[in-house]
Curated annotation (Swiss-Prot):
Cross-referenced HAMAP family: Exonuc_7_L (MF_00378)
Localization annotation: Cytoplasm
MF annotations from Gene Ontology: exodeoxyribonuclease VII activity; nucleic acid binding
Keywords: Cytoplasm, Exonuclease, Hydrolase, Nuclease
This protein's record includes keyword Nuclease: yes
Pfam families from the UniProt entry: Exonuc_VII_L, tRNA_anti_2
The protein's enzyme class: hydrolase
Gene Ontology terms: cellular component: cytoplasm; exodeoxyribonuclease VII complex
The family this protein is said to belong to: Belongs to the XseA family.
Organism encoding this protein: Clavibacter michiganensis subsp. michiganensis (strain NCPPB 382)
GO biological process, any: DNA catabolic process
This protein's name: Exodeoxyribonuclease 7 large subunit
General function of this protein: Bidirectionally degrades single-stranded DNA into large acid-insoluble oligonucleotides, which are then degraded further into small acid-soluble oligonucleotides.
This enzyme's EC code(s): 3.1.11.6
Length: 438
């Protein structure tokens, strides 16, 4: 049976190793594909914003993952969008992909751009809040107590910021010997969430850091959104070191406040809550010493009074009666002890005599004394049957007072009449020699 195969031939314009496309052809086809994509609404954060000749060139970053696109706002569109747009703004934009054939670059042409509505941000934030709450990250039983006196405090804050100065100054005023490990990060903008997240990990791995403080001197809602970043919040929740959030914003508190072990209203408040006040602690020590001194003095005085009362009792004025009253009782105990000891000794002697008698009865020598003999072969084993000593076998006879050598004449049924007068139940190993001659 024959089989027909269908072989697809490459299209006439398909590139091959022998007939490759020119770069311009490939670029033209890419542009054609991209032009067919049409327009799309996208949401993100502006991370770069710069103008030239009335046009704006920038970059738009995804709010959740590490993804960025370049965009262009022509001057005609720039005049129609909000004037306060710029780096750090969260926006929604209508874009059309545009591929530049000459340079081989892809950019998004912005047709419209506007701020993300506050309602949209709050709704997204609330959804994340509910998710984290359902996972138990806000539960009170997850909160850890701060150490009473941390040896080293990890501080995450902006470089040379007021928050940094407030924390350091107030903590050192309260406890001058406190140590800090400060990690400077961005506290707003597109780099802030990643830098703060990494800083938490670095300080959490440091065995000397006993507590971590994240401090920022307040700010508007947009600037504080970085502290509601999901990855940052989850990293803070998983932190093994007690963590304090000191963002300094009472309203619209970021999610970091909810997962932190302690929320401080301001950086100054954080400094006051992570270290004790040395003057207050010294005062407590002085008060405790005073209370202990008063208690000890009172207790000693009470014991002295009790001793004086005991000394004044008539029974202690003459102590001889204590000995006299116990002398007769002691005599009775001594007599009874002597009597009991005598009984024990007598009983022991009786038991010893009985055991001695039993030992003598069981002794092999006792059996020999009764006229029996132990017959042994040349190898020293006891002879138990006549068959074990055939004619001519050398034997040794152990008697009560010595030993004899003998030679077996073989088994015999002739037993001397005197053997009948021997005891009827000799020891198993002490049978009279049979058929042996000495």
């Amino acid at each position: 049976m024959s089989e027909t195969r269908s072989v697809s031939m490459p299209a006439a314009d398909a590139p091959t190793v022998d007939a490759p496309w020119p770069v311009s052809v490939l670029s033209g086809k890419i542009k054609g594909w991209i032009d067919r994509l049409g327009t799309a609404w996208v949401e993100g954060e502006i991370t770069q914003w710069g103008g030239s000749g009335g046009n704006v060139y920038g970059k738009l970053k995804d709010l959740d993952v590490d993804a960025t696109i370049s965009f262009t706002v022509w001057s005609s569109v720039r005049a129609k969008i909000p004037a306060d747009l710029g780096q750090g703004a969260r926006v929604v934009a209508l874009v059309k992909p545009n591929y530049w054939v000459k340079g081989g670059t892809l950019t998004m042409q912005v047709l419209e751009m506007r701020h993300v509505g506050l309602g949209d941000l709050l709704e997204r934030l609330e959804r994340l809040r509910q998710t984290l709450r359902a996972e138990g990250l806000f539960d009170a039983d997850r909160k850890r107590r701060l150490p009473f006196l941390p040896g080293c405090i990890g501080l995450i804050t902006g470089k040379d910021s007021d928050a940094e100065k407030d924390v350091l100054r107030n903590a050192q005023l309260r406890w001058p010997s406190v140590r800090f490990r400060v990690v400077h990060t961005a506290v707003q903008g597109d780099r802030a969430a990643g830098e703060v997240t990494r800083a938490i990990g670095v300080l959490d791995e440091d065995p000397e850091v006993d507590v971590i403080v994240i401090a920022r001197g307040g700010g508007d809602f947009q600037n504080l959104l970085v502290f509601s970043d999901e990855k940052l919040v989850r990293t803070a929740a998983a932190c093994r070191t007690p963590l304090v959030s000191a963002i300094g914003h009472e309203a619209d508190r970021p999610l970091l406040d909810d997962v932190a072990d302690l929320r401080a209203s301001t950086p100054t408040d954080a400094a006051k809550r992570v270290v004790p006040d040395v003057s207050e602690e010294l005062s407590r020590v002085q008060q405790a010493r005073a209370r202990i001194g008063m208690r000890l003095t009172s207790q000693v005085r009470g014991e002295i009074d009790r001793i004086e009362q005991l000394r004044s009792r008539p029974v202690l004025s003459s102590t001889a009666w204590i000995v006299d009253s116990r002398a007769e009782e002691l005599g009775r105990y001594i007599a009874r002890s002597a009597e009991l000891a005598g009984r024990v000794v007598e009983r022991g002697m009786q038991q010893t005599s009985e055991l001695s008698r039993q030992l003598r009865t069981l002794s092999p020598q006792h059996v020999l004394d009764r006229g029996y003999a132990i017959v042994q072969t040349a190898d020293g084993s006891a002879l138990r049957a006549p068959a074990d000593a055939p004619d001519g076998t050398g034997l040794a006879l152990r008697l009560a007072a010595g030993a004899l050598g003998a030679t077996s004449t073989g088994p015999t049924d002739d037993i001397p009449s005197s053997a009948a007068r021997l005891p009827s139940s000799p020891a198993p190993d002490a049978r009279p020699a049979s058929g042996a001659e000495s």
